[in-house]
């Protein structure tokens, strides 16, 4: 009986110690997250266009409360959070108008950029409204830009970020493939056009990932997380063309932000 009580007592002490250590580890992990100073930069895929619930104070930048930067900040309670991503932004816009919150204390930065520089909005407009041959020609022009001009643009903005935030972890997020090939769409673009658009997105992501790596940044690919949720999938996390709100066309829905972009960022942050 005495031995049983001793074993039970020892076990309770051990359990208490384990729980105390676990609690301490959890508290330390929470406090480390709370110490983060986070700045969210980029274009409409980071501002949250397409997910609704836009902050009226953000005006045409259309920063959504359902965008992944806000979702991450709400879940992790960083010490400070600055959200300057803006719809329509190009690399030069980031350099000129989004970097002021960055400083030597900044711990974490997120950014999606390059799609507008490469003219992907015009690509989609061309492909929707014009012939297949014109669509494919416009895609080829965008790919040429990604080859010849975009790398220098990305270098400039990445260098500016690192200069202002020398100690920050910088996570560069890519773009999803738009279409599920052989999917549920029975009208609209041809399979050839859809395949070429997907390939162009992959091409842009590869170029962006290379520039990010060259600067010591982390590239987080979202394409895999959108697999099964492309346009024509029957469970899309992306808007197709929306004639009533054209700016939301080909942007992630709220589900795309929470189910695609948020975990892609969280896993790399």
What do the predicted segments below correspond to?
Residues 1-30:
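Secretory targeting and sorting signals
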Residues 49, 93-146:
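Oxyanion-hole/transition-state-stabilizing segment in secreted/luminal serine hydrolases
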Residues 71-80, 152-169, 203-220:
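A structural motif corresponding to the C-terminal end of an alpha-helix
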Residues 25-39, 93-111, 154-168, 265-269:
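Short amphipathic alpha-helices and their capping/turn segments at secondary-structure boundaries
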Residues 51-54, 121-133, 184-187, 231-241:
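Short, flexible, mixed-charge acidic loops at enzyme active sites
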Residues 30-85:
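Serine-esterase "nucleophile elbow" of acetyl-processing enzymes
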Residues 176-269:
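Catalytic His-Asp segment of secreted/periplasmic serine-dependent ester chemistry enzymes
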Residues 37-42, 46-48, 80-85, 107-112, ...:
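Structural recognition of the beta-strand scaffold that forms the well-ordered cores
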